[in-house]
A protein has these predicted regions:
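An N-terminal hydrophobic leader/cap segment in hydrolases
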Residues: 1-53
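The serine-hydrolase catalytic nucleophile loop
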Residues: 86-98
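Conserved alpha/beta-hydrolase
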Residues: 100-119
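Alpha/beta-hydrolase active-site loop
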Residues: 124-144
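Hydrolase active-site cap/lid region
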Residues: 163-219, 228
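Short beta-strand/loop motif that positions the catalytic acidic residue
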Residues: 233, 239-241
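Catalytic histidine neighborhood in serine/cysteine hydrolases
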Residues: 260-275
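Catalytic active-site module of serine/aspartate enzymes centered on a nucleophile-bearing elbow/loop
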Residues: 280-322
Length: 384
């Protein structure tokens, strides 16, 4: 019996430190990135792949998407740097490609060290990654025709945004989806929910985990507190969090939002969990946010009072049926606009993005939407 308890404790301990710095790796091939040359909305785009040396000396695999010179709407174009989650890769950012490109913005995606096809064994949930962002931003700035830069991160990538942005005035705006505020708080939550250790053992387990991670990765998890950077960060920002996030509780975004130092900030909450595909209306709002601040360069106070800019939007208040109807109507409108602006032969050559390339390749919400749609169809048939 005693041996079983020891074995259980050992498994719990290993599960926790691996959850922090060695989660399941996203394995893919270069073919999964799609064609290096493609047509989208009557423009020809190219994907260029780069190898950059990280702050710790690891090769980071990166990709940059931009229109060919004859198709550039402007000589200088802004760039969004997308930062992926802890067990994800640059494929996650490619899932946002359409929304970014149609806003006349270029996209740069990266596999952080320890992720995807990049070198390295461990991640650091934003600590080392924040120094890697500087390496990437320095590189992006040297690409001919590059304008302002925005950051878009999810989970680990969102925490990285928060840690880094205040250090660099070149970052003009940021979007953070599912960030954590304080890793000490998060670690205790993970121990209680996922590892399920007794309360008396939590403190001791975290101390052992801290020393293990410090030895393996040089990361002191007690210093991993994005919330310390929040008051110092001034760029316009959007926070996004699912209300049923089982990995990072949505209260972490509440905490960050409350102390965020920028005058223009918005918190969007939606139905779903950590890896649920975000509603299309949120993705569109993010796209418009980047367009306003990177392309139109709207000033913080233009056409808005501070009261209007500092809002929390609980997008889960309406019924799910109403939301799905709204999304379908908006998607149909977008489709009609695209059909008017594109030739049929060009549409056949448009970039084909794998459905699995949307946030962490998980679409848990699709089944729920289909069920509701089937119910509505049955009601319509009965009425007829």
């Amino acid at each position: 019996m005693e041996n079983k308890e020891k074995e259980k404790s050992k498994m719990s301990y290993e599960s926790l430190w691996k959850l922090v710095i060695r989660p399941e790796r996203d394995n893919y091939t270069i073919k999964d990135l799609g064609n290096p040359k493609f047509t989208f909305l009557s423009r020809t785009y190219t994907r260029k792949d780069y190898d950059l040396l990280s702050s710790e000396g690891y090769i980071m695999k990166c990709s940059f998407f931009e229109p060919e010179i004859p198709f550039r709407p402007k000589k200088t174009m802004p760039v969004i740097l997308y930062l992926h989650g802890n067990s994800s890769s640059r494929l996650e950012g490619i899932g946002m490609l359409r929304e970014v490109l149609k806003r006349d913005i270029n996209l740069f995606v990266v596999d952080f060290p320890g992720s995807g096809l990049s070198e390295g064994e461990y991640i650091s949930l934003g600590y080392h990654e924040s120094y890697d962002v500087k390496v990437i931003v320095d590189f992006i700035e040297k690409i001919p025709g590059t304008g302002d830069i925005g950051l878009w991160g999810r989970s680990m990538g969102a925490a990285t945004c928060m840690i880094y942005a205040h250090r660099d005035e070149r970052i003009k705006c940021i979007v953070m989806d599912s960030p954590f505020a304080d890793f000490n708080v998060l670690a205790k939550e993970l121990v209680l929910k996922q590892i399920k250790l007794p309360n008396l053992l939590i403190g001791g387990a975290l101390k052992i985990v801290r020393m293990t991670i410090l030895k393996k990765n040089g990361l002191d998890i007690e210093k991993l507190k994005p919330i310390d950077s929040a008051p110092k960060t001034k760029q316009p920002a959007i926070f996004i969090h699912a209300v049923s996030d089982e990995l990072i509780n949505n209260k972490h975004s509440d905490m960050l939002f409350a102390v965020y130092g920028g005058k223009e900030k918005k918190l969007l909450k939606c139905i779903g969990n950590h890896n649920t595909r975000r509603p299309s209306r949120i993705i569109r709002e993010v796209g418009q946010f980047f367009y306003d601040h990177l392309v139109n360069k709207v000033q913080n106070n233009n056409n808005k009072s501070n009261e209007e800019a500092n809002n929390i939007f609980n997008l889960d208040l309406n019924s799910e049926e109403d939301k799905i109807k709204e999304e379908k109507e908006n998607e149909n409108q977008d489709l009609n606009k695209n059909n008017e602006n594109s030739q049929n032969n060009e549409e056949k050559n448009e970039i084909k993005l794998n459905n699995n390339q949307i946030i962490d390749h998980k679409e848990e919400s699709i089944n729920n939407e289909q069920k509701i749609e089937n119910k509505e169809n049955k009601k319509d048939n009965n009425n007829q």
